[in-house]
From Swiss-Prot:
Protein name according to UniProt: Cytidylate kinase
Species name: Rhodopirellula baltica (strain DSM 10527 / NCIMB 13988 / SH1)
Gene Ontology molecular function: any one: CMP kinase activity
Name of the coding gene: cmk
UniProt family annotation: Belongs to the cytidylate kinase family. Type 1 subfamily.
Xref: InterPro entries: Cytidylate_kin, Cytidylate_kinase_dom, P-loop_NTPase
Domain of life, source organism: Bacteria
The protein's Enzyme Commission number: 2.7.4.25
GO BP terms: nucleobase-containing small molecule interconversion; pyrimidine nucleotide metabolic process
Localization annotation: Cytoplasm
Length: 229
């Protein structure tokens, strides 16, 4: 079974997806780690960022494995190596070009085959797993997301005004909605969860409730299909 959780930056998708996966006994698929892994591999190979053909070729040949919350590239565990600022600053070269994104999307589908997965992003329910059993679109107002981000930064010793965060966030939202491939949008069959004023625990419980309803409905449909055969 595949459960997708999409939404804008700052909506809390990653933390909620991990908690939901843990509660259900599912695996959490960190699709961002996959883009980071390919980015790291490109850096190790010294491929130029403007050499799109070579980038596509590398993404096509890369052997990605996601196991026990660890990411492997060509059988090498690089789960720590991909979390550097250098990798972060270059992800866009792999995440934006449509041809490269298609290759990594194919790898995500391959990894998810036959597994119970919770995955999050901005296009998981629309582009990557359009036939997912349950699709959640997690969102909040721009102001709410900016306040949450400010609190997260403060916990790590960084100080930024809500206004600064909001301006950067609005720009990213605009860019994410305008992307030619994998743009930010709710799938037509996604359940939209508006989280303004909700605590992380309240969001988790609401998402779990919705997911369990999806699981029950899926089981009922499967049983009905078996009866009619």
């Amino acid at each position: 079974m595949i459960i997708t959780i999409d939404g804008p930056a700052g909506a809390g998708k990653s933390s909620i997806a991990r908690r939901v996966a843990s509660e259900l006994g599912f695996e959490f698929l960190d699709t961002g780690a996959m883009y980071r892994a390919v980015t790291w591999g490109v850096m190790q190979q010294g491929i130029a960022w403007d050499d799109v053909e070579s980038l596509v070729e590398f993404a096509d040949a890369a052997q990605l494995i996601w196991q026990d919350d660890r990411i492997y590239l060509d059988n090498q565990d690089i789960s720590e190596e991909i979390r550097t600022p250098q990798v972060t600053s270059h992800i866009r070269y792999l995440a934006d070009p449509p041809r490269i994104r298609e290759r990594i999307t194919a790898q995500q589908r391959r990894i998810a085959t036959g597994r119970d997965i919770v995955t999050e992003g901005r296009d998981q329910g629309t582009e990557v797993f359009p036939d997912a059993h349950c699709k959640i679109f997690l969102t909040a107002s721009p102001e709410e997301r900016a306040r949450r981000r400010q609190r997260q930064l403060a916990e790590n010793g960084r100080v930024m005004s809500v206004e600064e965060i909001l301006a950067a966030q609005n720009q990213r939202d605009l860019e994410d909605r305008m992307r030619p491939v994998g743009r930010l949008r709710a799938a037509s069959d996604a359940i939209v969860v508006q989280t303004d004023g909700m605590s992380p625990d309240e969001v988790r419980e609401e998402v779990l409730r919705l997911v369990r309803e999806c699981v029950q409905a899926s089981a009922a449909n499967s049983a009905s299909s078996d009866v009619t055969r």
